[in-house]
């Protein structure tokens, strides 16, 4: 029984970590869903700004009486755009918190594993049970999850940091660029892993 204790300590750490991942995945997905309409709003605003830039207000008789209308309209659109950017920044901050929360819990699991690695032995680590994947598999899956959040966050942060009001074409293309990031990712990675450990968590 004493020999089982180190293995049980690692398994207990894994059992604490995966529910945290599940909770954080919910927050991650919710933040990503919130971003879609915001990106569409930003794209539409860029389209409106482009249309206003291309329109020669002085050529429209009804608008000649309002010489500063073009600039006032532009300022109003930019203020609206900055509000949307702030909201996107809030969602990005949620993604960062998820990444950091998952990383800290994964790191804790690996610390516990390293403390007990010599006592547990490689055979026990590689051995799955009828309802439980091997500890080695679960540790690898946690690394996969952590890597997924880290890479996904960085790509999205880089995309949003590239937004410049001087480049309206780039802003109009944002929703498609955002979708490309999602398509390049393994969409169901976290959910698939959580499914693989569901029986283990119920033990």
Curated annotation (Swiss-Prot):
Effect of residue 73 to A: Loss of interaction with CINP. No effect on interaction with interaction with AFG2A and AFG2B
Principal location listed in the UniProt entry: nucleus
One Gene Ontology CC term in the entry: nucleus
Organism (species): Homo sapiens (Human)
UniProt name for this protein: AFG2-interacting ribosome maturation factor
Localization per record: Nucleus; Cytoplasm
Function in brief: Part of the 55LCC heterohexameric ATPase complex which is chromatin-associated and promotes replisome proteostasis to maintain replication fork progression and genome stability. Required for replication fork progression, sister chromatid cohesion, and chromosome stability. The ATPase activity is specifically enhanced by replication fork DNA and is coupled to cysteine protease-dependent cleavage of replisome substrates in response to replication fork damage.
Family annotation (PANTHER family): AFG2-INTERACTING RIBOSOME MATURATION FACTOR, SIMILAR TO HYPOTHETICAL PROTEIN FLJ20508
Assembly behavior: Part of the 55LCC heterohexameric ATPase complex composed at least of AIRIM, AFG2A, AFG2B and CINP. Does not associate with pre-60S ribosomal particles.
UniProt KW keywords: Cytoplasm, Nucleus, Phosphoprotein, Ribosome biogenesis
InterPro entries, alphabetized: CA109-like (IPR029159)
Superkingdom, taxonomy of origin: Eukaryota
Record note on what altering residue 63 to R does: Loss of interaction with CINP. No effect on interaction with interaction with AFG2A and AFG2B
UniProt modification remark: Phosphorylated on serines by CK2 kinase.
Gene Ontology BP term (one): ribosomal large subunit biogenesis
